[in-house]
């Protein structure tokens, strides 16, 4: 357990259960990723999970439930965010998935050997875990498994949610650091594109006439929608 000398009462809780904690320290750190890297150095297990202060495992049986699924480099479950269950819903993960979002480290189990090649980049305030996913899954070809288990209860309102400006700025910095601009142009263009129509494109491409017809139909619908909005404003 790595603490930064905060005064939220967590130290008293740790001391109460000190007999069940293998290692803990309370000292100043340089941010969340510095603290997480300190945890990596002290960890001796086969898999690592990083649970932030305030977050908690979903129930007492989570680790036993997840253990049989730990056969990949990164195993990811679900989280409870407020009253909703959040999680990655595809069987596998792609670079586009990471560009459009991220995977919460609180719901992730990492094979410890992954940190032999990369640690969390402490020069970032918010997106170093996102950068780590890109490095390990894209460049190191780490294996990935998505499971249905709910791993943790996540406390909303963290810095990644409340400081969107810094988050977006840091993500752009990661792009420049890891990818040539020419490689990222198409991905950046599609980053904000979220539409069920994308799933129809492969079928539409099989018939040029149908493709053009669908394009004209969508343009017409957008024109009508724009007219309706202007009428409502008036």
Question: Predicted segments — roles?
Answer:
Residues 7, 11-15, 165-169:
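Short, surface-exposed alpha-helical segments at coil->helix boundaries
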Residues 180-182, 186-234:
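Membrane-proximal basic amphipathic "stem/tether" segments
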Residues 13, 26-43:
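Glycine-rich, basic loop-to-helix element that forms the pyrophosphate-binding segment
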Residues 81-174, 178:
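Conserved nucleotide-sugar donor-binding catalytic segment
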Residues 10, 36, 59-65, 128, ...:
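Acidic donor-diphosphate engagement hotspot in glycosyltransferases and nucleotidyltransferases
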Residues 3-12, 52, 56:
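A conserved acidic beta->alpha catalytic loop
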Residues 56, 60-88:
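Conserved donor NDP-sugar-binding/catalytic core segment of glycosyltransferases
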Residues 48:
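Short aromatic/hydrophobic "clamp" motif used to bind/position activated sugar donors
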